[in-house]
Amino acid sequence: RIITLGLELGILQPGRIALAAPTGKAAVRLQEQIKDAFEQSPRSNSPNADDRPKAMTLHRLLGASADGSRFRHHADKLLPFDFLLIDEASMIDLLMMARLFAACGPETRVVLLGDPDQLTSVEAGSVLPDLCGGESASGKLAECRVHLNISRRAAEGTGILELAEHINTGQPQAALDWIQDPKNPHLHQVKGANVAP
């Protein structure tokens, strides 16, 4: 909704907005969400489907070479966008995040979406959790952080949200009680030689 509202108010300009995610699957999901947001927008001045921003992977956004060693956009050749919305930011490693910000102009607004408690990057660095800094965060970045309390992906009452809350807030006994409660989804303990310790 931030994009549709920004376009409606004239704060954002069509063609100057980029949407990206670390993986192709996340980019497809982001594109579907943007499509739904535009279709639900009550304003008649929303851009038509051809003018709407298209989601892509971070590698495509930055113009990565086939082997991923070179990028078309960098500090000397900036991205041509005023606004970047990056989904699943918890999956972005330190090197990719550095490349992303190096390719942004000084006036470019960047919105990072993600859950710092899940889907960490495979490569080095836990950038989103470090940027969020936990509950004790202070300073300019803390002033820009928004924490959503409602999950749009998991339905209320599915139970898994309750278990995640127990784990994320450091309540091991409550998590164990949830796991042992027969009304909750059944968990299977996996054993075998192919399972990492």
Feature roles, as predicted:
Residues 1-33, 113, 185-197:
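Conserved RecA-like ASCE P-loop NTPase motor core of nucleic-acid helicases/translocases
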